[in-house]
């Protein structure tokens, strides 16, 4: 189950994000909606007995072009040899690359760079 978080900064920037994952995070059909080519690779390797686990969750990321923080689907699977394949989303506003937030507890504000705080609004699934 994921969390609905409200991130706030003293500069006035705030955003509500759905972080983490829900029940659909292990549903191959749902993952394929977001990552069709990558899911084909997963299914092929899983059928060959090479996949240990897989999951899709919303990652909190920055778009440097838009100066926004967002939570978007990311998909990863770990093979039995220990190698992890990771696939993130692109910005839905500009199609640019995203940078994953390193510290979800107090990330830097995308507008001013100060540390942000969050509180949990609820859960989502």
Positions of predicted regions on the chain:
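His-enriched metal-coordination microenvironments in redox/metal-binding proteins
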Residues: 1-6, 123-125
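A broadly conserved detector of short glycine/acidic/proline-rich loop/turn motifs that flank catalytic sites
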Residues: 76, 104, 122
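Short, compact, well-ordered microdomains
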Residues: 97-118
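Short recognition patches in nucleic-acid-associated and regulatory proteins
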Residues: 13-60, 71-79, 84-100
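Short cysteine-rich clusters marking metal-coordination/redox-active sites
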Residues: 8-11, 63-66, 91-94, 109-112
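Short Cys/His-rich micro-motifs in 6-15 aa windows
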Residues: 68-72, 112-122
